[in-house]
């Protein structure tokens, strides 16, 4: 049986399986927090700027993951270690946590998943992803960057995009009603890759590529 951990709409994060998992783990691990609300536990220090306007801390943490339990648990453990090491929670701790987690996600977790498939292509795919940058781009723009890499890939541009989407490295993105950007990924909503939409490297993966 496959459990669905996806979160189609971030406004529903507090009804999700990820939220329930973390809430239960905190309450069973820390008796002193059993009477505190989830919002109190994840409260941001007043005046702290961590680059996420109008978004609460838990949502920001979830968006750094591939919406898989092991990703979120590892991120929270990393955050806990950094807080214990510094004795406080501030912008520096948040950034250091994000840096270490993203490095683990890309260079350990994802690398172990894609290396057996990509083999000799692996380092060139990493080069290609860095050429793509953090912004949205079309399949045509991706193909142009693909062709600029001095290497003969085993997968065609579209096949490579399908592969990268299915392992959670890229996601589809488009403007919805009112100009709001929408995102769809294999782990978040289980939607298929749409070549007619724009795409982008998932932020957590991009951060890991830059470490």
What are these regions (language model features)?
Residues 150-167, 172:
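Short amphipathic alpha-helical interaction segments
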